[in-house]
Amino acid sequence: MTRREPVQKRSRERVQAILGAARELLAQGGVEALTTRRLASFSGIPVATIYRYFEDRDAIIAAYLDEELASIDRAVEEALLGLDRVTFRSMSAAVAMAHLRHHQAHPEGIPVWFGTRLSTAVHDSVRELDARMAASLHAATRGAGFIEEGPHFGAGLIVRLWDRTFEHIFRIERSAAEQAAIVLDVIDMIASYMERFATPAGIEGISSAEFLKVLRRPAAR
């Protein structure tokens, strides 16, 4: 899936208008409601213009997911900044609760993140974002010195576990308190296991400012 990256201000505004309309259509009718024809009608942007920026519907959904992840990343940083000290456990809680609150506030994205009746291209986009999150988690925990020698599985499995957890949470109607209780239980399960491999820094923590420096550090190539 490819899309034309906008350069001019007007083009960027059009792309944002397209993605805003896509968000509204997802909220109104789910993934099935998101077609280029409906998108054009809802946004007032001609179909031909939409195709100038997005190859197809899957490319629109991929761009929507990119914006979702960027929003979640900002929420995670804000949550981490609110901590006096960041430990492996408090980091896990901040990240997981930021994801939960985002999905609670933006339920239109849940079928896209956790749905099964999606195209291969969209599933590939979700897997790519999962891989990015796993790489960020791995780099942050290692860079902060929280874990030196971990279990045989990697951060990717933890991210996949959270995917299945959120899929379970939103599969049926639950109150916000019930959703949070499930997340807190899974946080405790993961943190309790990973603390077997934690260093003193992973248990006692480092300052949030110090941790965010590590989190924002460019990934090694």
Protein language model annotation of sequence segments:
Residues 63, 77-104, 158, 183:
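Hydrophobic alpha-helical connector segments
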Residues 1-13, 198-221:
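N-terminal intrinsically disordered/low-complexity leader segments
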Residues 44-54:
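Short hydrophobic/aromatic patch on the recognition helix
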Residues 89-94, 104-135, 176:
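Short secondary-structure transition hinges
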Residues 1-29, 36-38, 42, 59:
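Basic, helix-initiating cap at the start of DNA-binding domains
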Residues 111, 115, 123, 143-189, ...:
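Hydrophobic/aromatic-rich alpha-helical bundle segments in the mid-to-C-terminal region
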Residues 26, 61-68, 75-76, 110, ...:
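Alpha-helical DNA-contacting segments of helix-turn-helix folds
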Residues 36, 47-49, 61, 65-69, ...:
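Membrane-embedded alpha-helical bundles of multi-pass transporters/translocases
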